[in-house]
Amino acid sequence: YCWFIIACNLWSISILICPMNNLSQKKILLTICGGISAYKSLELIRLLKKQDAEVKTILTKNAKEFVTPLSVASLSQGKVYDDLFNAENEAEMDHISLSRWADVILVVPATANTISKLSAGSSDDLASTVILASDKDVFLMPAMNVRMWEHPSTKQNLNKLKSYGYEIVGPEIGDMA
């Protein structure tokens, strides 16, 4: 089954579409984590929207240190989700509705912290809870310092996530910022 391949590496963003497939009407949940390369997620949103994909976004607490909810909302043309507990509508469980809505989940940049949390099955924020509650394809685009990338814990966590069926895309070598 040929979905589509998204190559959003640490230092370059491009979308490669399978020859017989396109992103029109695809529901993509973009989870933006707190790393210096988070700003590149803005370009990814723009590219996905240009391909007529439906994009919803989750910002982790740390992601908001690098990109603003306003810029993400402007590009995605929708609400930015950032809290596990929805004060506006307590009856709505965003982690369930978002996990059901998405055709695919992208984690950009997938930080060492996020990779560790997902590997451990932690669900202490909206992003990790949505992913844990989902049965959809999950693509992780790791972005971190080379020493963090090469650390045995990171390698072990990535191997565990691969065994769960998560797709790891990248990283490449280059500048993060």
Spans of features found by a protein language model:
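Feature targets compositionally biased, intrinsically disordered low-complexity regions
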Residues: 1-2, 17
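A cross-family phosphate/adenosyl-ligand binding-site feature
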Residues: 15-139, 145-177
